[in-house]
A protein has these predicted regions:
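Negatively charged, low-complexity tracts enriched in Asp/Glu with abundant Ser/Thr
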Residues: 1-24, 61-96
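A short, charged, amphipathic alpha-helix used as a generic interaction element across diverse proteins
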Residues: 139-151
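Amphipathic alpha-helical oligomerization segments
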Residues: 157-176
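A short, exposed loop/beta-hairpin motif centered on an aromatic-Gly-Thr core
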Residues: 128-140, 157
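Short N-terminal "domain-start" leader segments
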Residues: 76-117, 159
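Conserved small/polar residues in nucleotide/adenosyl-binding loops
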Residues: 178-180
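Long, continuous compositionally biased terminal/linker segments
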Residues: 33-66, 70, 74-77
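Short aromatic-glycine-(Arg/Gly/Cys) micro-motifs in beta-strand/loop hairpins
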Residues: 109-133, 168-170, 174
Length: 180
């Protein structure tokens, strides 16, 4: 993966988070603007550089955390896409790569003009094709979670949805208040 490819994909990811990547600087760093000022700079290896005086509020710290998470995630999946084997399946357009495969379930990705996109599929009985695609577009994390559930790596019964987690949080807070 080239520096340009990484920064282009990272720029897509940052814009989706309402952060503004600026043109590359002479030193090869990608500046990221937030709230009308430069928040940090990202290196081609995915490291995030910043001056602590720039991150002086909780909102600025949250924005910096988003940049750091995006830089690491994009580096992870771009490296995977670069090294992954092509997905061979009857009737499937070229360009998809196998990021993971387990128990008849495939996590695949492809690079498009609008950035990397991800999908999970079930393999056909004879493993010559794929079907029942769950398309996650640019949501790499969502595709990974779906792969873990569909493939059986994680049992559905052990995963809480947001509503269940909120109920647990409220119950724990209620217990904390009772015992104070």
């Amino acid at each position: 993966m080239t520096k340009e490819t990484y920064f282009e994909e990272l720029s897509y990811a940052l814009r989706r988070r309402e952060l503004l990547p600026r043109p590359l600087e002479e030193d090869g760093l990608l500046p990221v603007e937030w709230n009308g000022r430069i928040l940090c700079r990202v290196t081609e290896s995915g490291a995030v550089r910043y001056d602590p005086t720039w991150v002086d509020t909780s909102r600025a710290k949250a924005a910096l955390a988003q940049v750091t998470e995006a830089a690491g995630t994009v580096m992870e999946y771009m490296t995977l896409l670069e090294n992954a084997p092509p997905l061979k399946a009857d009737g499937l357009a070229d360009g998809y790569r196998v990021l993971a495969e387990f128990n008849g379930t495939v996590l695949a990705g492809t690079e498009t003009l609008l950035g990397a996109q991800f999908v999970t599929w079930a393999r056909d009985y004879d493993r010559s094709g794929v079907n029942n695609g769950h398309y996650y577009m640019e949501d790499y994390q969502g595709a990974r979670e779906d792969f873990a559930l569909r493939s059986g790596l994680v049992a559905r019964e052990r995963v809480f949805d947001r509503e269940q987690l909120e109920g647990l949080r409220q119950a724990v807070q209620g217990l904390s208040l009772i015992h104070i």
